[in-house]
């Protein structure tokens, strides 16, 4: 059976956890706080709400060998974030840049499928992971380190150790740009990366629909509180063009992400239509940015805007 290669740090953590003795705790809630409207007794005062710490004991540092690091984020899943990450990274490489792509979606890594890559990465004599290479860029993913047919059922400590190894123990060589594909949401992974790694810019991906835009605001709030520059928004699935009659249908609404970007003083890096070719090429392991299709132009535009803002 195939195992995972995050050997030393995570096995030590498992050993520590296995030695812990079970404890029994009784939790009591104040009757005054519990009601039919608020059965959990959650404080309603904004002053008591948890806040993202603005300062940490550790200053964010660049990843060794990497000149610029950007993250691709979506506070909501299913908006095509990984597709944007992959094709933007490939379009940056087409500009002559040395590019790496790091998939830090611990529980749902999809980058290996989109690149048609499998197997386990080799390791250096120093014990660092060597990224796989395809289409001219370096690729590392949690998907290379675990059994692809089994769920990653880890809790906080193991997730933290896995994330630390992906951030610290990969030998990238020398890169002009590292693109990080973040998991959806605004949880521990995003916060840890924002507070420990020097991020030169963030791309936020959204569809035009209102449900996705609500989460965009949460993502923007996270980056503002961690002092991370947002390079702009990508409006994905902006329109569907019928392949038979060329009729345009705005399935998810019209320019919702564009309007949200303008209201927050942000630019729009690009609009990507809902195109079956983009999906099918990703499933085949040959993304449109390298397959030569007309769809590549959308990601080339995004890459142009990113490179201009990064100064690379």
Curated annotation (Swiss-Prot):
Transit peptide: 1-34
Pfam families tied to this protein: ParA
Membrane topology: Peripheral membrane protein
Residues involved in ATP binding: 75-82
Gene Ontology CC: mitochondrial inner membrane; mitochondrion
Cofactor binding note from Swiss-Prot or TrEMBL: Binds 1 [4Fe-4S] cluster.
Function description: Required for the effective assembly of the mitochondrial membrane respiratory chain NADH dehydrogenase (Complex I). Probably facilitates the assembly of Fe-S cofactors and subunits of complex I.
UniProt xrefs under HAMAP family: Mrp_NBP35
Identification of the protein by name: Iron-sulfur protein IND1
């Amino acid at each position: 059976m195939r195992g995972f290669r995050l050997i030393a740090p995570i096995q030590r953590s498992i050993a520590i956890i296995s030695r812990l003795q079970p404890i029994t705790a009784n939790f009591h809630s104040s009757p005054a706080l519990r009601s039919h409207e608020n059965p959990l007794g959650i404080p309603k005062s904004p002053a008591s709400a948890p806040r993202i710490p603005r300062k940490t004991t550790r200053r964010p540092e660049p990843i060794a060998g990497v000149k610029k690091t950007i993250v691709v984020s979506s506070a909501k899943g299913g908006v095509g974030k990984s597709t944007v990450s992959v094709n933007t990274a490939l379009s940056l490489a087409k500009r002559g840049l040395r590019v790496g792509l790091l998939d830090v979606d611990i529980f749902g890594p999809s980058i290996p499928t989109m690149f048609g890559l499998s197997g386990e990465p080799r390791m250096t004599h120093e014990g660092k992971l060597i990224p796989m290479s395809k289409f001219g860029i370096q690729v590392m993913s949690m998907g290379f380190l675990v059994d692809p047919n089994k769920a990653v059922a880890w809790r906080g400590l193991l997730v933290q150790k896995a994330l630390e190894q992906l951030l610290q123990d990969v030998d990238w060589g020398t890169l002009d740009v590292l693109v990080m594909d973040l998991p959806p949401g605004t949880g521990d992974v995003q916060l840890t990366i924002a507070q420990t790694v020097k991020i030169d810019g963030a791309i936020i991906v959204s569809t035009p629909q209102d449900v996705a835009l609500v989460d965009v605001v949460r993502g923007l709030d996270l980056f503002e509180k961690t002092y991370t520059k947002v390079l702009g928004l990508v409006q994905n699935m902006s329109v569907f063009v019928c392949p038979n009659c060329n009729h345009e249908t705005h399935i998810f609404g019209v320019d919702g992400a564009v309007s949200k970007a303008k209201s927050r003083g942000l630019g729009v890096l690009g609009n990507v239509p809902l195109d079956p070719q983009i999906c099918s090429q990703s499933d085949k392991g040959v993304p449109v940015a390298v397959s030569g299709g007309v769809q590549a132009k959308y990601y080339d535009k995004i890459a142009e805007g990113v490179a201009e803002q990064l100064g690379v």
